[in-house]
Amino acid sequence: MFMKSTGIVRKVDELGRVVIPIELRRTLGIAEKDALEIYVDDEKIILKKYKPNMTCQVTGEVSDDNLKLAGGKLVLSKEGAEQIISEIQNQLQNLK
């Protein structure tokens, strides 16, 4: 993952809060009361605007590239779809 430095440094307050500057929130389309997901990658903390509908129901992968199927009731990543296809094929083989 490529990360671009903003040059912005913020201190954590006594309650563990960090303020995201308004310029950065505007640039990233983060409004007041928006939910953010928190990820950890090695020693990095990654904040991402929460998109509840794009989480793969098999792998847990969150991506805008995930597939929405069955009228939006099922969300799958490429890997999740491959796992489901493989399991269905195995089940169908066992029925024969």
Curated annotation (Swiss-Prot):
GO terms for molecular function: DNA binding; identical protein binding. The keyword Disulfide bond does not apply. Pfam families: AbrB_C (PF18277), MazE_antitoxin (PF04014). Disulfide bonds: none annotated. Residues 7-52 form the SpoVT-AbrB domain. Interacts with BrxC. PANTHER family: PTHR36432, TRANSITION STATE REGULATOR ABH-RELATED. Ambiactive repressor and activator of the transcription of genes expressed during the transition state between vegetative growth and the onset of stationary phase and sporulation. It controls the expression of genes spovG and tycA. AbrB binds to the tycA promoter region at two A- and T-rich sites, it may be the sole repressor of tycA transcription. This is Transition state regulatory protein AbrB. It comes from Bacillus subtilis (strain 168).
